A protein has these predicted regions:
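Hydrophobic faces of well-ordered beta-strands that scaffold small-molecule active sites
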Residues: 3-5, 44-46, 75-77, 106-110, ...
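Active-site mouth loops of central-metabolism enzymes
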Residues: 12-26, 80-88, 173-183, 282-291
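An alpha-helical appendage that flanks or caps ligand/catalytic pockets
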Residues: 5, 128-166, 208-308, 340-346
Length: 346
């Protein structure tokens, strides 16, 4: 089981709650990735967002910078919003990062965007949501599977490629491409039919209820003739601290801030601390606790989903940077070995 973290960037807050510099948020994210590598985490994902509170707008640039400053950790986009980006550029940026890393440490997770701020930003129509994603995912896979630098492709959402060079190629020839989903059955079936590993973003509810989706994914893959590379990963909110109470107290303010912001955008009701506490204990979706608590809950979920990677987002809503760094260290040095021991004993 790989243990990791992910982030959309987290702009720090002043004491009065006003945001500091988004550039500071990016520097903090870079420092966190380097710290995660040194601590021994397996994976760090950078999710594309374009808001003042979540400023990680260029995963490829951050991954390339981190690739030069790290030596072991797997780096990936979590996710790249390919519906509103050019898959040629996404591939080139991540292949460049792969070359900088020495090869074998860079992945792409392709998403279509549950947060839709990229559509007005880049001039796309939400009415084309499904068509954009389907065609651009096909283009990304076509580029990745090409045996040479030369690629041909045609579709309706982008100009045709007619034996054009797409460079650089990844060190090993291809990059791992994951399909991101928040729990859509059609996306699970699509990932299986395409033979792609699937990454579930679970931000609420009871994660074990995703078991039918993982079964659908594996069944779809088998029916399509795919047996290799059929993998499941899970991304959840989570923060690790020396004690459960410390973790709960540290994570709550950022969670509250995020839900106030999302409530304004999406018409949600006011965040409720009782809901937060319920989600932060089994069988809820927030992996907020001490190392024993978090490890045990990851292993419990593994019994339902059989996932090979679990990664946590802790920095949201202005979480103090030192709390994130401590969480990353505890994930690597305390949670990861506990998970390994618990799985070995099953």
């Amino acid at each position: 089981m790989e243990i990791g973290a992910y982030s959309f960037g987290d702009t720090p807050l002043n004491p009065d709650g006003s945001p500091r510099s988004t550039a500071e948020g990016i520097r903090n994210l870079f420092d966190a990735i380097v710290a995660a590598d040194r601590a021994g985490l397996d994976y760090f994902g950078i999710g594309e967002h374009h808001t003042v509170s979540m400023p990680a707008s260029s995963p490829g640039a951050l991954i390339a910078a981190a690739a030069a400053a790290t030596s072991q950790i797997i780096l990936g986009s979590a996710a790249s919003i390919i519906s509103t980006d050019d898959p040629v550029r996404v591939f080139q940026q991540l292949a460049t990062a792969d070359a900088i890393s020495g090869g074998g440490r860079v992945e792409i997770t392709a998403g279509r965007g549950s947060s839709v701020e990229t559509f007005p930003l880049f001039g796309y129509d939400l009415a084309d949501y499904d068509r954009l994603y389907a065609e651009k995912l096909d283009l990304l896979m076509t580029i990745n599977e090409s045996p040479t630098e030369t690629v041909s492709w045609s579709g309706t959402v982008r100009p045709t490629l007619d034996e054009l060079a797409v460079v650089p190629r990844p060190v090993a020839g291809r990059l791992p491409i994951w399909l991101a989903t928040g729990g859509n059955a059609a996306s699970s079936a699509r990932a299986g039919k395409l033979g792609l590993p699937v990454s579930y973003g679970i931000i609420g509810g009871e994660p074990h209820r995703f078991a039918p989706l993982t079964e659908l994914y594996r069944r779809s893959a088998a029916q399509a003739g795919y047996t290799e590379n059929i993998k499941v990963s899970v991304a959840t909110f989570g923060l690790v601290a020396p004690t459960k109470q410390e973790a709960l107290d540290r994570f709550y303010p950022g969670w509250h801030n995020l839900n106030v912001e999302m409530g304004r955008l999406r018409g949600w009701g006011a965040p409720d601390r009782r809901q937060y506490l319920a989600q932060s204990h089994a069988p809820g979706a927030y992996y907020v606790g001490d190392p024993d608590d978090v490890a045990e809950r990851i292993v419990h979920l593994h019994g339902y989903l059989g996932h090979m990677r679990h990664f946590l987002q802790g920095d949201l809503g202005g979480l103090p940077h030192e709390h994130l760094l401590e969480s990353l260290t505890l994930l690597a040095t305390e949670v990861k070995p506990r998970v390994a021991r618990l799985l070995a004993a099953k």
